[in-house]
Amino acid sequence: MKLLRKRDYPGGKFTLAFVGYGDESNNTVIELTHNWGQAEPYDLGSAFRHLAVGVPDVYKTCERLASAGVKIPRSAGPMAHGGSVIAFIEDPDGYRIELIQRP
């Protein structure tokens, strides 16, 4: 696995790093987030904060999930520091799953 790309978001005080085995258009990629100055553990411990899954249309995905009763703590819309369309859903244990629209 290798670092494919990395980007700092000074306005949001976080860095995103994307790792994988090949080109992002044809291979699975893991997005790692480093929140600058995070001193306290996250709500559910310090193992991880959330997973992200790429989907073709975040808005339509959220509509389908909401109609199935899935909790959506952050509705679909553009990311404040980057412009990608994202949303967050919660699993039954309270872990967040980010939905990010694939380009």
Language model: regions and residue ranges:
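Vicinal oxygen chelate
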Residues: 35-96, 103
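Generic signature of intrinsically disordered, low-complexity segments enriched in small/polar residues
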Residues: 12, 17, 21-24, 45, ...
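Core segments of cupin and vicinal oxygen chelate
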Residues: 1-27, 67, 80
